[in-house]
Amino acid sequence: MEPGFWHEKWQQQQIGFHQQDVNPFLVTYWHQLALPADAKIFVPLCGKSLDMCFLAEQGHQVIGCELNELAVQQFFSDNQLPMQQSAEGEHQHYQTEQISLYQGDIFTLPQSITAEVSGFYDRAALIAWPESMRAQYAKQLAYLLPQGSVGLLVTLDYPQEVLSGPPFAVSPTWVETHLSEDFEIQPLACQDVLADNPRFVKKAVPWLNEAVYLLKRR
């Protein structure tokens, strides 16, 4: 996934991957992580997700990383949140009371920024990468997360040959094969969400499974 591709999607507002509501799996399963209210939570490739507002409402300190500047700016403007902007290395840092967003490349995000996180949430990051780059991202996520940190991973799976991503199809087998070295993996739920995704229906995708996993960094 080239940076230019992602920037173009946001510039043209072709952001079908953006959810207008908080993810139901997040609402249902977040409490199973049993994290304290003041825990720091890392959200990779966060976009302008409302899920970050949900996490902040639980009392958490949210640390997000997003490549596209427009996505970050829209998060604060859409939610009417005041923010302060500063440069931090090669990343731009946007800060409000409980949410800090770092705009830039996740592969160059300093490990020091996530050194104190105890939780993480990946709904749109892993599935944003084509298979050729996905394992590299998974290793970078593991590098950024402290040992013992826990989080939720949400994936989509469908016949990839029917529709090109993003979001890309990530199977349970891929998750187990590529993440088990760095994470303990506990599948929590899986459901067919085809009816809720008109783009996939229009392209005659026969099924679309959304799954949620509880991960713990080894």
Swiss-Prot record:
Query: Source species, please?
Result: Shewanella oneidensis (strain ATCC 700550 / JCM 31522 / CIP 106686 / LMG 19005 / NCIMB 14063 / MR-1)
Give the classification, highest ranks. Bacteria, Pseudomonadati, Pseudomonadota, Gammaproteobacteria, Alteromonadales
Its top-level enzyme class, in one word, is transferase
List ligand-binding residues for S-adenosyl-L-methionine.
W10, L45, E66, R123
Which GO terms label this protein's molecular function in UniProt? thiopurine S-methyltransferase activity
Q: Please state what the protein is called.
A: Thiopurine S-methyltransferase
> In the UniProt record, which is one GO cellular component term?
cytoplasm
Question: Which NCBIfam families does this UniProt record tie to the protein?
Answer: PRK13255.1 (NF009732), TMPT_Se_Te (TIGR03840)
**PANTHER family recorded for this chain?**
THIOPURINE S-METHYLTRANSFERASE (PTHR10259:SF11)
Any one Gene Ontology BP term:
response to metal ion
Q: What is its main location?
A: cytoplasm
Q: Quickly give the catalysed reaction.
A: S-adenosyl-L-methionine + a thiopurine = S-adenosyl-L-homocysteine + a thiopurine S-methylether
Q: Which InterPro entries match?
A: SAM-dependent_MTases_sf, Thiopur_S-MeTfrase_Se/Te_detox, Thiopurine_S-MeTrfase, TPMT
Name of a matching Pfam family: TPMT
Superkingdom of this protein's organism: Bacteria
Assigned EC number: 2.1.1.67
Subcellular location, record wording: Cytoplasm
Keyword DNA repair among record annotations: no
The entry's keywords? Cytoplasm, Methyltransferase, S-adenosyl-L-methionine, Transferase
Q: Which family does it belong to?
A: Belongs to the class I-like SAM-binding methyltransferase superfamily. TPMT family.
